[in-house]
Amino acid sequence: VSLTDEEIRLIQHIWSNVNVVEITAKALERVFYVYPWTTRLFTSFNHNFKASDKQVHDHAVNVSNAISAAIGDLHDINKNFSALSTKHQKKLGVDTSNFMLLGQAFLVELAALEKDKFTPQYHKAALKLFEVVTEALSCQYH
């Protein structure tokens, strides 16, 4: 998956106009409730999976920082996510399908937040972003 310059511009515009930690926390909460098996990776959260819970918020900060860094350098994302991919594979044992589940949850949250501003062009660009992120986070699995 590759992004056009226009899609990168749209992604940067979307990301700069939302509270990235808040939307990430909401996306994480959605994943935890819609796909409950994903919570097995977060036993330290003590079954507190709401966006407002401290552990979810703290993880949202980490995730949003990683996505923000990716958006800042989309042309070299595999290199930039190499260590994170290794951590998710070897240390945490994360199934790569979970990355796309989070991406889909982001799309829902962005659409709910942006409403009419979340045009088909924005949707396509955001979807491709999360496909690129998923590929990058999965690069050390192969």
Swiss-Prot record:
In the UniProt record, the signal sequence range is none
Q: List the disulfide bonds.
A: none
Instruction: Give UniProt keywords alphabetically.
Output: Heme, Iron, Metal-binding, Oxygen transport, Transport
Q: Cite the record's tissue specificity text.
A: Red blood cells.
Give me the residues that bind heme b, please: 59, 88
Would you kindly state one Gene Ontology biological process term found in this protein's UniProt entry? hydrogen peroxide catabolic process
The lineage's top-level taxon is Eukaryota
Give residue ranges for domain Globin.
2-142
PANTHER family in the cross-refs: HEMOGLOBIN FAMILY MEMBER (PTHR11442), HEMOGLOBIN SUBUNIT EPSILON (PTHR11442:SF7)
Subunit comment: Heterotetramer of two alpha chains and two beta chains.
Q: Would you identify the family this protein belongs to, as annotated?
A: Belongs to the globin family.
The record's function comment reads: Involved in oxygen transport from the lung to the various peripheral tissues.
The protein depicted here goes by the name Hemoglobin subunit beta-1
- Source species: Torpedo marmorata (Marbled electric ray)
- Gene that encodes the chain: HBB1
